[in-house]
Swiss-Prot record:
GO terms for cellular component: cytoplasm. One of its GO terms (biological process) is positive regulation of translational elongation. One of its GO terms (molecular function) is translation elongation factor activity. InterPro entries: IF5A-like, IF5A-like_N, NA-bd_OB-fold, Rib_uL2_dom2, Trans_elong_IF5A_hypusine_site, Transl_elong_IF5A_arc, Transl_elong_IF5A_C, Translation_prot_SH3-like_sf. It is found in: Cytoplasm. It comes from Haloquadratum walsbyi (strain DSM 16790 / HBSQ001). Keywords: Cytoplasm, Hypusine, Initiation factor, Protein biosynthesis. Its main location: cytoplasm. The keyword Cytoplasm applies. Belongs to the eIF-5A family. This is Translation initiation factor 5A. It comes from the Archaea.
């Protein structure tokens, strides 16, 4: 699995973290100051990269969490049928089918950028 461990205090807004076993992009990060006998706590909120579900995480700032290594790749649209597009990876020429986001207009020969993590893909 392409992921690494980091301390919660090293996380930043806009980066990725694993929450509930799925990669999420961090929307907000806040810390509560430490109490008399405890350590500072961090609250992390984010949206799932591939499923857009909202998730949150509350941990001490020195706790370790998994950070996914999400690859950003280039592809070319081969064909578009309905809401699906056939994409060819420009690095290894592998073809696969992906769902086209509703807010994007695609036509054959367009070059796109997509995210990939453990077989899951999403057009950016």
């Amino acid at each position: 699995m392409p992921r690494e461990q980091k301390q919660v205090r090293e996380l930043q807004e806009g980066s990725y973290v694993m929450m509930d076993e799925s990669p999420c992009e961090i929307n907000s990060y806040s810390t509560a100051k430490p109490g008399k006998h405890g350590s500072a706590k961090a609250r992390v909120e984010g949206n799932g990269v591939f499923d857009d579900r909202k998730r949150s995480l509350s941990q001490p700032v020195d706790a370790k969490v998994w950070v996914p290594i999400i690859e950003r790749k280039q592809g070319q649209v081969v064909s578009v049928t309905g809401s699906d597009a056939q994409i060819m990876d420009l690095d290894n020429y592998q073809t696969f089918t992906m769902r086209v986001p509703e807010d994007q207009d695609m036509s054959p020969d367009d070059e796109i950028e997509y995210l990939e993590y453990e077989g899951q893909r999403k057009i950016v």
